[in-house]
């Protein structure tokens, strides 16, 4: 929707299944490239999970998504098929087969509170987690502490409708089971490394200054 423009729509069936907001009011975009279609195809480049996202976007564009067994979703993206809109997908440092780090990150969500504390001091909305569909939006006059407490205890973290699941080993395996390679798209995958080999050993350790995420 950020590319083409329009109101984000998570689909009636999907929204009902996970009890999320189907059309978050603050996710309506003008579009970076409104003319995007089969006559004006694009190249997608995704870093980290962005590689998975690009592949999923192709799936949503080229498959009919149903509201129920008989009725298509009432959405241009979900209820119709758009082929040949993507020329290539390039992923950079994307864990297409999942990463064990996903479980570590999920369990250390409370660590975010430290950063949000800073955000509270400087009075910024930078740490909006862009999860309005789950209700992860700071309410009027809600303190940062209350906001984080509400977020940490949300049921979203235990569902498959969250990034930590998609990036996990099991989640990536499930995604790969239905995201098929398209004969109309060129695929490129660029790998990276931030480790160095220990002298006199076969072990590799993180390079100095490497971030955990």
Positions of PLM-derived features:
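Active-site catalytic motif of lipid deacylating hydrolases and related acyltransferases
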Residues: 1-42
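Long, hydrophobic/aromatic-enriched structural stretches that serve as scaffold segments
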Residues: 39, 53-60
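Short beta-strand immediately N-terminal to the catalytic nucleophile in serine-hydrolase-like folds
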Residues: 44-46, 92
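Gly/Ala-rich beta-loop-alpha elbow adjacent to hydrolase catalytic centers
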Residues: 46-50, 54
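Helical cap/lid subdomain of alpha/beta-hydrolase-fold lipid enzymes
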Residues: 59-213
């Amino acid at each position: 929707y950020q590319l083409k423009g329009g109101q984000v729509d998570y689909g009636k069936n999907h929204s009902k299944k996970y009890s999320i907001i189907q059309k978050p009011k603050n996710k309506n975009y003008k579009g970076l490239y409104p003319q995007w279609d089969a006559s004006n195809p694009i190249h997608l480049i995704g870093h980290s999970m962005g590689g998975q996202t690009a592949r999923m976007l192709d799936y949503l564009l080229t498959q009919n998504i149903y509201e129920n067994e008989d009725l298509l979703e009432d959405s241009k993206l979900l209820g119709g098929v758009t082929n040949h809109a993507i020329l290539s997908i390039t992923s950079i440092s994307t864990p297409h087969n999942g990463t064990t780090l996903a479980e570590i990150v999920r369990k250390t969500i409370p660590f975010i509170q430290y950063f949000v504390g800073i955000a509270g001091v400087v009075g910024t909305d930078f740490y909006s987690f862009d999860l309005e569909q789950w209700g992860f939006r700071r309410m009027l006059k809600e303190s940062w502490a209350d906001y984080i407490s509400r977020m940490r205890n949300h049921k979203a973290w235990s569902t498959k409708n969250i990034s930590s699941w998609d990036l996990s080993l099991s989640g990536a395996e499930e995604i790969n089971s239905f995201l098929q390679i398209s004969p109309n798209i060129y695929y490129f995958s660029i790998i990276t490394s931030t480790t160095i080999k220990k002298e006199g050993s076969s072990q590799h350790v993180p390079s100095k200054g490497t971030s955990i995420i």
